[in-house]
């Protein structure tokens, strides 16, 4: 299972990108949200690897929350990767969480390819879905803090000291957060 790709952006279209990873070029389907946020030559995408009888497809996302939303959507009967990607293209994970919390069937129907029956099914199937999960995973700072906290715990630091140190750090990148927190933890 391929869960992520990092490499050089070879080409970029609204629905897919080609990413060169160590000499192998992968075609990765992306949402319009990810397409508009892509910049630069180097790209890192969280991916969902969908294996069908006739194809193996990669769907890529800049945000972990968008990937979690996509993977939850394709588990719904009648919602395939194309419809799930259309939802991810229409709404950010936090916007879709609001739609779910409000049970807004007309907002779901605004997505191309979704009629009233499918919209109702999506709202029913996702009624117990933890929208906080996709919102928190979409915020890079909170994701980086969680990863940094995990790394520091594996080094043997106590959770309360880790929380205190990370609370004083301002970085958004996991590696920089760990470095800053380590400096602070040495003084505590």
From Swiss-Prot:
Coiled coil: none
Entries under InterPro entries matching the protein: DNA_helicase_Holl-junc_RuvA_I, Hlx-hairpin-Hlx_DNA-bd_motif, NA-bd_OB-fold, RuvA, RuvA_2-like, RuvA_C
Superkingdom of source: Bacteria
Region (Domain I): 1-62
Keywords from the UniProt entry: Cytoplasm, DNA damage, DNA recombination, DNA repair, DNA-binding
Annotated region described as Domain III, given as residue ranges: 140-188
Molecular-function GO term, any one: four-way junction helicase activity
Family the entry assigns: Belongs to the RuvA family.
Family matches, as NCBIfam families: ruvA
Record's subunit section: Homotetramer. Forms an RuvA(8)-RuvB(12)-Holliday junction (HJ) complex. HJ DNA is sandwiched between 2 RuvA tetramers; dsDNA enters through RuvA and exits via RuvB. An RuvB hexamer assembles on each DNA strand where it exits the tetramer. Each RuvB hexamer is contacted by two RuvA subunits (via domain III) on 2 adjacent RuvB subunits; this complex drives branch migration. In the full resolvosome a probable DNA-RuvA(4)-RuvB(12)-RuvC(2) complex forms which resolves the HJ.
Name this polypeptide is given: Holliday junction branch migration complex subunit RuvA
